Amino acid sequence: EKIFDAARVSILDGESYQIKISQRYEAGVRVNPLIAFDKLCLANPAPEAFLLQTKSFSLVSCSPEIVIEKNKDVLLTRPIGGTYERKKKEDTNSVIECFLNDPKEVAEHNMLVDLERNDLSSVCKPGTVRLTRFREVETYAHLHHLVSTIEGKLKDQIHLSEILSAMLPGGSITGCPKIRTMEWIDKLEPCFRGPYTGSFGLLSDNGDISLNLIIRSMLIFDDCCYTQSGGGIVVDSNAGYEYKENNLKARALLELLS
């Protein structure tokens, strides 16, 4: 909780508007990657799930988020920002109504949308960047999320490296302003993120791109595994609540080890 509180203090000092702080969880157990992936997909199905197996490690992710999707000259991003716990016995409609009217969650999401619009605008033609979905609620096994979709038409002669530089890392796991906030994340977080909050996907021969955000993930070695989760800190955040939210996000993965 001290790190979350330190992030909030840096915001009060004017260093950032929003900081996405993550924490790592470690389990000293042997995990079968294929079984873990199967369990995760059954418990928490998500559209961007994947399993990567190598000789030295495996990476399992059940990501719901698209960072970059390029189809011909259209570039799209689908940021997720804002989280509510989903309880077994709840009036879903009333919970969603409260979620959509929560000032902190709405402010967090709006800042994220502005950040991603700016990122898209740097590589898209003027006047083409638009919101096609705004602040919609998507429900998963343990959580409700606020989601928006933003797209634009790419400028002529834009190179792949320019797109990747503009859009990565995704704003939903950094905060804003992006560069300064990443510097604060580097100061505050005690662990290197590794593949967590990176991207995985396809770069097609025809120039199309599909890259997700590596969250809801588990990095598996022979005798141990790691998972990591993060939450957004804004000026009116409660450090204890954000710490609890991070635990909720990690729970779906940690339960696979039991």
Label for each model-derived stretch:
Residues 1-258:
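Extended alpha-helical targeting/anchoring segments
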